């Protein structure tokens, strides 16, 4: 298996948040073995765990003790892919910067600054098959010695039905895939107070028969690649790198988190949490 890992030095990222439209800054701090992944905002530590999820509509948000951080899935996905197990992610602002809409900038900076530690990783290993479903969407998890994630989408435009499978070792096949939306969704997203920082610089915008971004798609199946990337980020809310085989049909953050909670419950996940017994979401 592998050793726990942190970063060699502090790493900083900054930019606009896709939903708040506000400027924010992120500082990743090295931590010792056994610390885990945690966020830090205004004096409050928020463990990157499913118990602290407070919102899953168009993003995965965490909160604790009156502090909330939006859109954690991309940075968590990169940390998961690189098996970084011990860092504190300091957030100055209310949301993780969206950067170009993909995980590439996070991935490149962190990959070059990995520090192996002296403790073996305690992986979360899927022990038996489990399925979660909701209104025609489903995710299935099965045992596997590696992490394998398949996403199948059914889109109401020129994309049609697409499918992509990620296997360990092919991280660069998904970290460049950008977050996306459809032009008919934009009005609703804005109406509910989200997407304030979205633009063609950080979001792949698709119509019935066109791509609005002048550079076009990075891959013909870029949206399903990004969905795989998102799911890997949400899976890291189990608290450890995951070994299992996953298949998602039309899943999103809400179903991803539902799966995580079911896996944790079924396997009686009782790892120590760095907080007092009662966990209260915002």
Curated annotation (Swiss-Prot):
GO molecular function, one term: metal ion binding
Pathway membership: Glycolipid biosynthesis; lipid IV(A) biosynthesis; lipid IV(A) from (3R)-3-hydroxytetradecanoyl-[acyl-carrier-protein] and UDP-N-acetyl-alpha-D-glucosamine: step 2/6
Origin superkingdom: Bacteria
SUPFAM superfamilies (alphabetical): Ribosomal protein S5 domain 2-like
Listed result of changing residue 234 to A: Almost loss of activity. 1.5-fold decrease in zinc content
Catalytic activity, reaction form: a UDP-3-O-[(3R)-3-hydroxyacyl]-N-acetyl-alpha-D-glucosamine + H2O = a UDP-3-O-[(3R)-3-hydroxyacyl]-alpha-D-glucosamine + acetate
Effect of residue 253 to A: Loss of activity. 4.3-fold decrease in zinc content
Entries under Pfam families matching the protein: LpxC
GO BP: lipid A biosynthetic process
Function: Catalyzes the hydrolysis of UDP-3-O-myristoyl-N-acetylglucosamine to form UDP-3-O-myristoylglucosamine and acetate, the committed step in lipid A biosynthesis.
Protein name: UDP-3-O-acyl-N-acetylglucosamine deacetylase
């Amino acid at each position: 298996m592998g050793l726990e890992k942190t970063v060699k030095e502090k790493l900083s990222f900054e930019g606009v948040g896709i939903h708040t439209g506000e400027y924010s800054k992120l500082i990743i701090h090295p931590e010792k073995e056994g610390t885990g992944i945690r966020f830090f905002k205004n004096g409050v530590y928020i463990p990157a765990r499913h118990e602290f999820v407070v919102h899953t509509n168009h993003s995965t948000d965490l909160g604790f003790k009156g502090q909330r951080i939006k859109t954690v899935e991309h940075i968590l996905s990169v940390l998961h892919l690189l098996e970084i197990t011990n860092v504190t992610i300091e957030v100055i602002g209310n949301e993780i910067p969206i950067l170009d809409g993909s995980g590439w900038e996070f991935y490149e900076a962190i990959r070059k600054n990995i520090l192996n530690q002296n403790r073996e990783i305690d992986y979360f290993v899927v022990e038996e098959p489990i399925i979660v479903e909701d209104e025609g969407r489903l995710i299935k998890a099965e045992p596997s010695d590696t992490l394998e994630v398949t996403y199948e989408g059914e889109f109401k435009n020129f994309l049609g039905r697409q499918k992509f499978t990620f296997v360990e070792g092919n991280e660069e096949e998904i970290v460049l895939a950008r977050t996306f939306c459809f032009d008919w969704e934009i009005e609703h997203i804005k109406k509910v107070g989200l997407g304030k920082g979205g633009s063609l610089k950080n979001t792949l915008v698709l119509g019935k028969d066109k791509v609005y971004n002048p550079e076009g798609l990075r891959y013909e199946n870029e949206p399903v690649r990004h969905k795989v990337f998102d799911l890997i980020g949400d899976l890291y809310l189990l608290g450890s790198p995951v070994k299992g085989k996953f298949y998602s049909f039309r899943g999103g953050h809400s179903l991803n988190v539902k799966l995580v909670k079911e896996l944790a419950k079924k396997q009686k996940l009782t790892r120590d949490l760095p907080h007092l017994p009662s966990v209260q979401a915002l």
